[in-house]
């Protein structure tokens, strides 16, 4: 019997605000435990929450970028449950009226496009964190760090439109790209800034009714998402084929062993006893506010990708790579403004610039070779001042010193040799030293031509004009 997986993702996006969602405490990561708390995020009696306006703006941005409708009157609700890291005994979230609804993202996989629905995006506060190790004060037990409590989150809930782990990862990567592109999330999955829960079920191929789902909680890498979903799909299929029944439950992914493990029975909405939070008035978002946010949106990745392809005549692969992050796309576009050959710039940004960044551990924002310097280097290649090989030498020196490419070329005597007489003299010398190879070439071994080119370039220390070398060599070797 064949089975079909059905997958929906709930993605938690930690917002990059300076302060928390309902108080003025800092959201910075890595501070001493419980050093960024106040009566509001500690849940002390009488402390009242005040909504952070920046959180609402970020939510509207996310909704517009994912083709959602913005709810113009939404409310906050209390989600009631007990856990040691939840000091109030409830989480302030949204239930019936989320801030964004009914959006979508298109994903591309194996040359095909598929639209994935987004049910809702809602604002909520994060809980604290239980610390099970490295707590000197506790010999045997756990500590509670409430620095993260009240940190602003968006929860992005997809429709159950995903049918494989690859589709889930593709959707997740696109959502990650959008929220980091907008600047509303740093996207750091290791620190929990972007994490997801995967709802997975299986049904017989062609069936209309979905199977019983299991929810895999808090997966924090794309690789783990793929592994967890694939394991869970196979676990459920094996269970059904053995005559068992899939139980609706919450599971955790164990990355060390590549398996999911049962955590608890899966709660339904009524288990949380949602009701409107009496301490927070309804949130009203008027048309003017939505329009102001819309006007402030940057050009989004997919639109920029298509524009790069049409405006700069680069292939889809290049455009995909260059729009992987907003800073990289902006760097490329600034380079093209300095040197108008879009494909040449693309080759250098994807090649030498990326290599330099990887080797030095730098981000594109801190690249020592500015767009102006790279543009200047490419102009020296275009006008024949230096060869492509010499350009790489100049680039490495620019990376180290930040000097102008023309200055480096002059200081190191790297100007390309385009004098026929000088190049012919080198060719004559090479042919005199390699008479055997000359005879073999003239007898039909054309592949030896590359050998002669290499010898001439070596003798000229890479400065001979390659096209002129090829032209003159062909003439001389003909005899």
UniProtKB/Swiss-Prot annotation:
Quaternary assembly: Heterotrimer of A, B and C subunits.
Function recorded in the entry: Allows the formation of correctly charged Asn-tRNA(Asn) or Gln-tRNA(Gln) through the transamidation of misacylated Asp-tRNA(Asn) or Glu-tRNA(Gln) in organisms which lack either or both of asparaginyl-tRNA or glutaminyl-tRNA synthetases. The reaction takes place in the presence of glutamine and ATP through an activated phospho-Asp-tRNA(Asn) or phospho-Glu-tRNA(Gln).
Gene Ontology molecular function terms on file: asparaginyl-tRNA synthase (glutamine-hydrolyzing) activity; ATP binding; glutaminyl-tRNA synthase (glutamine-hydrolyzing) activity
Alphabetized InterPro entries for the sequence: Asn/Gln-tRNA_amidoTrfase_suB/E (IPR017959), Asn/Gln-tRNA_Trfase_suB/E_cat (IPR006075), Asn/Gln_amidotransferase (IPR018027), Asn/Gln_tRNA_amidoTrase-B-like (IPR003789), GatB (IPR004413), GatB_C_1 (IPR042114), GatB_Yqey_C_2 (IPR023168), Gln-tRNA_amidoTrfase_suB_CS (IPR017958)
Protein name, as recorded: Aspartyl/glutamyl-tRNA(Asn/Gln) amidotransferase subunit B
Reaction(s) this enzyme catalyzes, per UniProt: L-glutamyl-tRNA(Gln) + L-glutamine + ATP + H2O = L-glutaminyl-tRNA(Gln) + L-glutamate + ADP + phosphate + H(+); L-aspartyl-tRNA(Asn) + L-glutamine + ATP + H2O = L-asparaginyl-tRNA(Asn) + L-glutamate + ADP + phosphate + 2 H(+)
Annotated GO biological process: glutaminyl-tRNAGln biosynthesis via transamidation; translation
EC number: 6.3.5.-
Family matches, as HAMAP family: GatB (MF_00121)
NCBIfam families per UniProt: gatB, PRK05477.1-2, PRK05477.1-4, PRK05477.1-5
Similarity remark: Belongs to the GatB/GatE family. GatB subfamily.
